């Protein structure tokens, strides 16, 4: 009799995705982040569900309801901080996952890569709306500043912003709709993640060499299930350390002050994972130009497959592009630091230089180095 996991219509899909899936024998720990993102998403949906049971999306009671969760609900503080810091873990895994794709040329899987970019935008939108929900000072002013950027769109801008707000300012209607979207988006993200996986399994995984690995495949289970499990335990250990010892490390103290439309905080800034994009936005003096640069800072990922000039897929054997890659990583860290600094000298010029070098490395220097390396190998 055929094994049920190979014959049952439902189990068969799971079997082909997580058990009998042929995987390259040499994929490193950089390939762990896909499964870790799945774990992060599950943690966020579960903790979010329990938070939603006690949260009220009304401007008068939102802040109090979060306080109530932390003080009166059994383990409410734990659920709240797991959710808040879980978002940070989500973004750490996301950035490492994208960075891995960039380094090893995984962007040549076009469909998988493009769904990934849509996922990145969806997660960023979800995180932004989630940050508004506690209705603290930074929640309110962050929502005001970021939604206001849409007013830079010619002709329809102002109307669009008022339509999103549901009035003439960020108010009750805005909070209610943000809660609704924040609740539904993670389920859309989960569906998109399945599509992401579906496209990946059409081609099979990439590997550190960037070469075809059809000749050397191993079953996903037990090899990579146990490897992923180790990653999951390490992730949870890191998350729990953050939650139990430093719960407010990555948060903003201003968000412990209830939202007040009459009092602007001295420094309006988003959560740490948006700071690099925020720095790029601020480095352009023109409003519309800043918005375009902000969107392009992420959307530039979609151009990567067309900017690939090398005959090699991965950066493993390409030392010049490797150097550029790590300069790009350092550059992003500088942008993250600048995004959290006030708009004054010398931070303005540092941010502008870092923004220029960010786009230059991706659009100009990396494609040139790909051609140069091919020339050095006499492959051209």
Curated annotation (Swiss-Prot):
<dbReference type="GO" id="GO:0007584">
    <property type="term" value="P:response to nutrient"/>
</dbReference>
<dbReference type="Pfam" id="PF00032">
    <property type="entry name" value="Cytochrom_B_C"/>
</dbReference>
<keyword id="KW-0679">Respiratory chain</keyword>
<dbReference type="GO" id="GO:0009725">
    <property type="term" value="P:response to hormone"/>
</dbReference>
<feature type="binding site" description="axial binding residue">
    <location>
        <position position="97"/>
    </location>
    <ligand>
        <name>heme b b566</name>
    </ligand>
</feature>
<keyword id="KW-0830">Ubiquinone</keyword>
<dbReference type="GO" id="GO:0051592">
    <property type="term" value="P:response to calcium ion"/>
</dbReference>
<dbReference type="InterPro" id="IPR027387">
    <property type="entry name" value="Cytb/b6-like_sf"/>
</dbReference>
<dbReference type="GO" id="GO:0009410">
    <property type="term" value="P:response to xenobiotic stimulus"/>
</dbReference>
<feature type="transmembrane region" description="Helical">
    <location>
        <begin position="33"/>
        <end position="53"/>
    </location>
</feature>
<dbReference type="GO" id="GO:0005739">
    <property type="term" value="C:mitochondrion"/>
</dbReference>
<dbReference type="InterPro" id="IPR036150">
    <property type="entry name" value="Cyt_b/b6_C_sf"/>
</dbReference>
<feature type="transmembrane region" description="Helical">
    <location>
        <begin position="77"/>
        <end position="98"/>
    </location>
</feature>
<dbReference type="GO" id="GO:0005743">
    <property type="term" value="C:mitochondrial inner membrane"/>
</dbReference>
<dbReference type="GO" id="GO:0031100">
    <property type="term" value="P:animal organ regeneration"/>
</dbReference>
<dbReference type="GO" id="GO:0046689">
    <property type="term" value="P:response to mercury ion"/>
</dbReference>
<dbReference type="Pfam" id="PF00033">
    <property type="entry name" value="Cytochrome_B"/>
</dbReference>
<dbReference type="InterPro" id="IPR048260">
    <property type="entry name" value="Cytochrome_b_C_euk/bac"/>
</dbReference>
<dbReference type="GO" id="GO:0016020">
    <property type="term" value="C:membrane"/>
</dbReference>
<feature type="transmembrane region" description="Helical">
    <location>
        <begin position="288"/>
        <end position="308"/>
    </location>
</feature>
<keyword id="KW-0812">Transmembrane</keyword>
<dbReference type="GO" id="GO:1904421">
    <property type="term" value="P:response to D-galactosamine"/>
</dbReference>
<feature type="binding site" description="axial binding residue">
    <location>
        <position position="182"/>
    </location>
    <ligand>
        <name>heme b b562</name>
    </ligand>
</feature>
<keyword id="KW-0479">Metal-binding</keyword>
<feature type="transmembrane region" description="Helical">
    <location>
        <begin position="226"/>
        <end position="246"/>
    </location>
</feature>
<dbReference type="InterPro" id="IPR030689">
    <property type="entry name" value="Cytochrome_b"/>
</dbReference>
<comment type="subunit">
    <text>The cytochrome bc1 complex contains 11 subunits: 3 respiratory subunits (MT-CYB, CYC1 and UQCRFS1), 2 core proteins (UQCRC1 and UQCRC2) and 6 low-molecular weight proteins (UQCRH/QCR6, UQCRB/QCR7, UQCRQ/QCR8, UQCR10/QCR9, UQCR11/QCR10 and a cleavage product of UQCRFS1). This cytochrome bc1 complex then forms a dimer.</text>
</comment>
<feature type="transmembrane region" description="Helical">
    <location>
        <begin position="347"/>
        <end position="367"/>
    </location>
</feature>
<keyword id="KW-0408">Iron</keyword>
<dbReference type="InterPro" id="IPR005797">
    <property type="entry name" value="Cyt_b/b6_N"/>
</dbReference>
<protein>
    <recommendedName>
        <fullName>Cytochrome b</fullName>
    </recommendedName>
</protein>
<keyword id="KW-0249">Electron transport</keyword>
<feature type="transmembrane region" description="Helical">
    <location>
        <begin position="178"/>
        <end position="198"/>
    </location>
</feature>
<dbReference type="GO" id="GO:0001666">
    <property type="term" value="P:response to hypoxia"/>
</dbReference>
<dbReference type="GO" id="GO:0008121">
    <property type="term" value="F:ubiquinol-cytochrome-c reductase activity"/>
</dbReference>
<dbReference type="GO" id="GO:0032991">
    <property type="term" value="C:protein-containing complex"/>
</dbReference>
<dbReference type="GO" id="GO:0045471">
    <property type="term" value="P:response to ethanol"/>
</dbReference>
<keyword id="KW-0999">Mitochondrion inner membrane</keyword>
<keyword id="KW-0472">Membrane</keyword>
<keyword id="KW-1133">Transmembrane helix</keyword>
<comment type="similarity">
    <text>Belongs to the cytochrome b family.</text>
</comment>
<comment type="function">
    <text>Component of the ubiquinol-cytochrome c reductase complex (complex III or cytochrome b-c1 complex) that is part of the mitochondrial respiratory chain. The b-c1 complex mediates electron transfer from ubiquinol to cytochrome c. Contributes to the generation of a proton gradient across the mitochondrial membrane that is then used for ATP synthesis.</text>
</comment>
């Amino acid at each position: 009799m055929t094994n049920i996991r190979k014959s049952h219509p439902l189990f068969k899909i799971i079997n082909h995705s997580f058990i009998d899936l042929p995987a390259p024998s040499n994929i490193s720990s950089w390939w762990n982040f896909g499964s870790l993102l799945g774990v992060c998403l599950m943690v966020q949906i579960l903790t979010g569900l329990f938070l939603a049971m006690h949260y009220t999306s009304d401007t008068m009671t939102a802040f109090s309801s979060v306080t109530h969760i932390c003080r009166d609900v059994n383990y409410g503080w734990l659920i709240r901080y797991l959710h808040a810091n879980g978002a940070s873990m989500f973004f750490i895994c996301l950035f490492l996952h994208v960075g891995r794709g960039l380094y090893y040329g995984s962007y040549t899987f076009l469909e998988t890569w493009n769904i990934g970019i849509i996922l990145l935008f969806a997660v960023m939108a979800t995180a932004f709306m989630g940050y508004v929900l506690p209705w603290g000072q930074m929640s309110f002013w962050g929502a005001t500043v970021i939604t206001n950027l849409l007013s830079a769109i010619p002709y329809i801008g102002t109307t669009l912003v008022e339509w999103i707000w549901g009035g003439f300012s960020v108010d009750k209607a805005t909070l209610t709709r943000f809660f609704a979207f924040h609740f539904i988006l993670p389920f859309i993200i989960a569906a998109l993640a399945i599509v992401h996986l579906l496209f990946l399994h059409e081609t099979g995984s990439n590997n550190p060499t960037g070469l075809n690995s059809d000749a050397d495949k191993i079953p996903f289970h037990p090899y990579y299930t146990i490897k992923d499990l180790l990653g999951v335990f390490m992730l949870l250990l890191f998350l729990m350390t953050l939650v139990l010892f430093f719960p407010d490390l990555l948060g903003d103290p201003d968000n412990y002050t209830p939202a007040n439309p009459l009092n602007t905080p001295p420094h309006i800034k988003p959560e740490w994972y948006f700071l690099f994009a925020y720095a790029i936005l601020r480095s352009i003096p023109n409003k519309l130009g800043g918005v375009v640069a902000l969107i392009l800072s992420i959307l530039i990922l979609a151009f990567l497959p067309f900017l690939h000039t090398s005959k090699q897929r991965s950066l493993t054997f390409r030392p010049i592009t490797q150097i550029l890659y790590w300069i790009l990583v350092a550059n992003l860290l500088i942008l993250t630091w600048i995004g959290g600094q006030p708009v004054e000298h010398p931070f303005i010029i540092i941010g502008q230089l870092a923004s220029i070098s960010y786009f230059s490395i991706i659009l100009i220097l990396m494609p040139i180095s790909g051609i140069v390396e091919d020339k050095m190998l006499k492959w051209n």
